[in-house]
A protein has these predicted regions:
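A helix-coil-helix interface module used to build multimeric assemblies
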Residues: 1-191, 197, 201-207, 216, ...
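Short beta-alpha connecting loops at secondary-structure transitions
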Residues: 11-15, 60-62, 269-289, 311-325, ...
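Amphipathic alpha-helices that form helix-helix packing interfaces
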Residues: 30-33, 123, 127-130, 134-137, ...
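Alpha-helical support elements that line or immediately flank enzyme active sites
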Residues: 32-33, 115-127, 236-245, 250, ...
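Glycine-rich cofactor-pocket loops
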Residues: 139-161, 260-264, 268-272, 277-278, ...
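A short, charged helix-loop
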Residues: 207-223
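A conserved active-site cap/scaffold subdomain adjacent to cofactor or substrate pockets
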Residues: 228-260, 267-329
Length: 448
């Protein structure tokens, strides 16, 4: 991922330094397990020496890999040189026990899954923070009236707090999915060339995985099956889609013609090189753009599931790009989403103006039901309501200041509703008498 979107914490997790540090820890733990097992000759003293002297140098690893064309062998060679550097001349080299009975993928796959759990922990924290902001702001804006839209068209009144509440619930589901995906990918495997433990005792796998906080794969091939990784990638794509949904709503509400909400615009910020008046929703647009990357990378993960026989390497090159990019992009998205949610500026007066923009047609469903209650059929009531609404639409489309929807109903003999009935109907809060239950449910939402 390019530096522009790489956060320090997430970037470190997918750095070579972190990967090599995890590799080193796995190799040391494997030596300690072998010493405890006591079946291959390594002593506890040698394992302790390996623990104390194990090290690596990234630049040196790169130099060795330029010759070997094999990253694991290059790393092991470099690590071994540090382990043996202070061994007395003529003594047996402790490094001979490093990687004993293991294959490269035992190291690489176990380390990768550990990295992915580290990365998941960051995303879980960020999603949790965004969800808590949404829950708090939902209650702050529970009485901020706005228009609800379906198909982009004004539908019925609602409150802006309901928007925040909906996002809080969706982020909670993402939080649950991320935690489940983390558990699903938290596996290690140290089982040899094709998973048979032909040259290594299963105890080593169990020992290393327990120390790392991983479960041991019950039956791996040479690799940990990629359905684990595909499931995680699918969850990342879902979280990205949630971010995109919120950001898309932000963009739509910030349009000049709507202007009910606006993302933070900092002092000194510029909107356009050519048009100084512009205040563009660039944060929300960035979130939408990066969502496409994360969603597309999920397809890569699903394509990586079908490997040849017990393993091929076709997944490796794709994973090196797609996994890091997805986590780094989503981390950036969530960081920006948190900024957007916390700093979102709302314009209640503009919301009120938009509520009145359709001249009362928002109340058509209430009028329909009230007419049905007078005893006429639904079809007859629908005809009365629609015919008057279409006249209002026509006035709006032609830029005319014609009668409001209520005024047209009052002038229509087919509408038998009284003034008192219409007063009750044309109250936007009449739509929200039962919305209290939504906030009672939201109050019980546990985001810890």
């Amino acid at each position: 991922m390019i530096d522009r979107y790489t956060g320090k914490e997430m970037g470190h997790i997918f750095s070579l330094e972190n990967k090599y540090a995890i590799w080193q820890e796995i190799e040391v733990l494997a030596c300690e397990a072998q010493a405890e097992l006591g079946t291959i000759g390594i002593t506890r003293e040698e394992a302790a020496w390996i623990r104390a002297h194990a090290n690596f140098n990234r630049a040196e690893v790169d130099e060795i890999e330029a010759v070997t064309n094999h990253d694991v062998i290059a790393f092991l060679t470099n690590m071994g040189s540090y382990i043996d550097a202070e061994v007395p001349h003529g003594s047996a080299k402790p490094s001979r026990w490093v990687h004993y009975g293991m294959t490269s993928t035992d190291l690489g796959d176990t380390a990768l899954c550990y990295q992915l759990t580290q990365a998941c922990d960051i995303l879980i924290r960020r999603v949790q923070s965004c969800a808590k902001i949404c829950k708090r702001r939902a209650f702050e804006e529970r009485n901020t009236l706005c228009v609800g839209r379906t198909h982009g068209i004004h539908a019925e009144p609602m409150t802006f707090g309901m928007k925040f509440g909906s996002w809080a619930w969706e982020l909670k589901r993402d939080l649950d999915r991320l935690r489940d995906a983390r558990k699903n990918v938290a596996y290690g495997a140290i089982s040899g060339a094709v998973g048979t433990y032909s040259s290594i005792d299963p105890f080593v796998e169990e020992y290393v995985c327990e120390k790392l906080g991983l479960a041991h794969d019950p039956l791996s091939t040479q690799v940990i099956s990629r359905d684990h990784h595909a499931y995680l990638a699918g969850v990342l794509a879902t979280v990205a889609a949630t971010c995109e949904r919120i950001a898309t709503e932000m963009r739509a509400l910030q349009k000049t013609d709507t202007l009910e909400a606006e993302e933070p615009f900092r002092k000194g910020q510029k909107g356009s090189s050519a048009m100084p008046h512009k205040r563009n929703p660039i944060t929300a647009e960035k979130i939408c753009g990066l969502s496409r990357v994360v969603k597309a990378n999920a397809q890569v993960a699903f394509d990586n599931v079908a490997l040849w026989h017990e393993r091929d390497i076709s997944h490796s090159s794709a994973e090196r790009v797609a996994q890091a990019d997805s986590f780094i992009a989503l981390d950036h998205m969530l960081t920006k989403l948190e900024f957007l949610l916390e700093g979102m500026v709302l314009y209640p007066e503009q919301m009120k103006a938009n509520l009145n923009k359709t001249r009362g047609m928002l109340f058509s469903s209430k009028v329909l039901l009230a007419l049905v209650n007078t005893g006429i059929t639904r079809e007859e009531a629908y005809k009365v309501v629609q015919s008057n609404a279409m006249r209002v639409w026509s006035d709006i489309q032609q830029g005319m200041d014609g009668p409001t929807f209520r005024e047209r109903l009052e002038a229509d003999p087919a509408c038998t509703l009284t003034k008192e009935q219409l007063d009750t109907i044309f109250d936007p809060w009449s739509f929200l008498t039962r919305s209290k239950v939504l906030f009672e449910r939201l109050e019980r939402l546990d985001l810890d």
